[in-house]
Amino acid sequence: MADKRDYYEVLGVDKNASDAELKKAYRNLAKKYHPDVNPGDTTAEAKFKEVNEAYEILSDSQKRSRYDQFGHAGTDPNGFGGAGGFSTDFDFGGIGDIFETFFGGSGFGGRSKTRRGPQKGADIKYSTEISFEEAAFGVEREINVSKMEVCSKCTGSGAKPGSNVTTCNHCNGTGQVQIKQNTPFGQFINTKTCDACKGEGKIITEPCPACNGKGRLRSTKKIKIDIPAGIDDGQTISLRGGGDPGVKGGPNGDLYVNIRVKPHPLFTRQGNNVVCEVPITFTQAALGAELEVPTLDGKVKYTVPEGTQTGSVFRLKGKGIPYLRGNGRGDQYVKVNIEVPKKLNDKQKALLREFAEISGDDSHEQRKGFFDKMKDAFK
């Protein structure tokens, strides 16, 4: 025991090193000293064994705890540490990754990929455009989706109807073959997908002419979707099972429909509220007026009070967008913009001049306040 180096020193890590730090150090050293990288180098081989021994202990929480308490004696199967010391068996969870690097595939059977079983079909993404009103109140839409369908001729088998499907004699129907490799540490078995049957375990002697042996065909299918009221631009509707069919009995993929909403010439959307800008004349603003205001439900009458200022906003309760998941609707906000005429006839100009002479500043509170502040600022 006295000749053994400290395991943490062997791996070049601190005693408080995390599992990830241990694994990283181990991988780097194992690659550095691996016998296949250093053929005939007995020093490198000894280092490699030392690194594996250190990692075998420190990667196991119970063994590491005994080592931290009792040192090498705690890992000696003949000492008071009990069973669990170093043996020639490697920790497959760690060294298996190293052998993948040098030999490819999976050197240990327990980590090999199994033959492919049922697989979910591919998901399909689709985009459709709807109007502002359709987004507000919902709509049923029929879309044409390009998707894979099970071949009706061979019912998905890929074989010509009436032909024979034989078991692959390369893998005996397992879909996998094993390759034995001799290494300085013994014989390792690498499991890989059978090239002859591509992992299917069967050989189709006469492929289906309709689908070229694939068992599926691409086609365009009409699908009806219900777009709910209140949906917003950029939101997605999912239809479970609306995607491509599964493989080997697996479930169908899903269909995801992205909704794009066309801009409206009058309305803009803010959450579940609708904003509309309405132009009025300066006489309507000054005297007040009954206006026809467009809403999603049609035109409604609304009276703006006298003295309305440009930029004033009025609320029409419950005239907005329906809530997507719940009752009720948002509101509509009407923003008033006062339009000043660009052309006036002589009579109109004369009347306005007369109005200006008799109005004074008392009827223009904002203007009067502004000039009062300006006088104070430049005293």
Curated annotation (Swiss-Prot):
Protein biosynthesis in keyword set: no
Subcellular location: Cytoplasm
One Pfam entry name: DnaJ_C
CXXCXGXG motif repeat spans: 151-158, 168-175, 194-201, 208-215
Record-annotated J domain positions: 6-71
Annotated InterPro entries: DnaJ (IPR012724), DnaJ_C (IPR002939), DnaJ_domain (IPR001623), DnaJ_domain_CS (IPR018253), HSP40/DnaJ_pept-bd (IPR008971), HSP_DnaJ_Cys-rich_dom (IPR001305), HSP_DnaJ_Cys-rich_dom_sf (IPR036410), J_dom_sf (IPR036869)
TM ranges: none
Cofactors required: Zn(2+)
SUPFAM superfamilies in UniProt: Chaperone J-domain, DnaJ/Hsp40 cysteine-rich domain, HSP40/DnaJ peptide-binding domain
PROSITE patterns: DNAJ_1, DNAJ_2, ZF_CR
Zinc finger (CR-type): 138-220
GO annotation, biological process: chaperone cofactor-dependent protein refolding; DNA replication; protein refolding; response to heat
Binding, Zn(2+) 2: 168, 171, 194, 197
Cofactor note: Binds 2 Zn(2+) ions per monomer.
A GO term, aspect molecular function: heat shock protein binding
Binding site for Zn(2+) 1: 151, 154, 208, 211
Keyword hit for 4Fe-4S: no
UniProt KW keywords: Chaperone, Cytoplasm, DNA replication, Metal-binding, Repeat, Stress response, Zinc, Zinc-finger
Cellular component GO terms, alphabetical: cytoplasm
Function: Participates actively in the response to hyperosmotic and heat shock by preventing the aggregation of stress-denatured proteins and by disaggregating proteins, also in an autonomous, DnaK-independent fashion. Unfolded proteins bind initially to DnaJ; upon interaction with the DnaJ-bound protein, DnaK hydrolyzes its bound ATP, resulting in the formation of a stable complex. GrpE releases ADP from DnaK; ATP binding to DnaK triggers the release of the substrate protein, thus completing the reaction cycle.
Family under the similarity heading: Belongs to the DnaJ family.
Notes on the domains: The J domain is necessary and sufficient to stimulate DnaK ATPase activity. Zinc center 1 plays an important role in the autonomous, DnaK-independent chaperone activity of DnaJ. Zinc center 2 is essential for interaction with DnaK and for DnaJ activity.
PANTHER family listed in its UniProt record: CHAPERONE PROTEIN DNAJ, DNAJ HOMOLOG 1, MITOCHONDRIAL-RELATED
Subunit relationships: Homodimer.
Protein name per Swiss-Prot or TrEMBL: Chaperone protein DnaJ
Organism: Ruminiclostridium cellulolyticum (strain ATCC 35319 / DSM 5812 / JCM 6584 / H10) (Clostridium cellulolyticum)
